Amino acid sequence: MSTSIHERIRVEIEDLHEFFCNWFAGKLPKADFDSKFTARFAPDLVFIPPAGELLGLADLSSVIYDGYASNPKFRIQIREVTVRQEFDSYVLATYEEWQHDALASKPPDNGRVATVVFKIDNPLKWVHIHETWLPKTVMASDKYDF
């Protein structure tokens, strides 16, 4: 697997999660939503959060948009980005997402592992995201000091 695709994947994952922190803090203009959020995803995106619901792009966009400026203390740290497979024009990757003061999550300090599929394009497109909680013992061992 090429180093450049791994770097592109890592940067894209970190950039999207930085968007979340800034969006929920109200630090971005609302007019930036489509260019900084919606445009990152394939139109037929599938997102499965830890609770197991199946969301498409319209549903996910609505939830994120409605959360604007709702949680200024929210923080995310991305860890362990790993490219698992490259096939045709797609990449399968995993990463850990650690959240601090996530008011919409139970518990608000939490960790999850995500499996994602990207379409290799310019820019990369998120096609599929599946998150699951990290074990409670793992979550409890973190200091959440990011």
What do the PLM-derived regions correspond to, one by one?
Residues S70-K73, Q99-N110:
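Short, cysteine-centered beta-strand-loop-beta hairpins and adjacent loop/turn segments enriched
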Residues F47-I48, A93, H128:
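Short hydrophobic/aromatic-rich beta-strand segments that constitute the beta-sheet cores
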Residues M1-A39, P43, Y144-F146:
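Short, low-complexity N-terminal intrinsically disordered segments enriched in polar/charged residues
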Residues I64, I78-R84, E96-Q99, R112-I120, ...:
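Hydrophobic/aromatic beta-strand elements that line small-molecule binding cavities or substrate pockets
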Residues A31-S89:
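A solvent-exposed, acidic/Ser-Thr-rich amphipathic alpha-helical stretch
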Residues D109-F146:
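Short beta-strand edge/turn micro-motifs at domain boundaries
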Residues P43-D44, T94-D101:
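Generic short beta-strand segments
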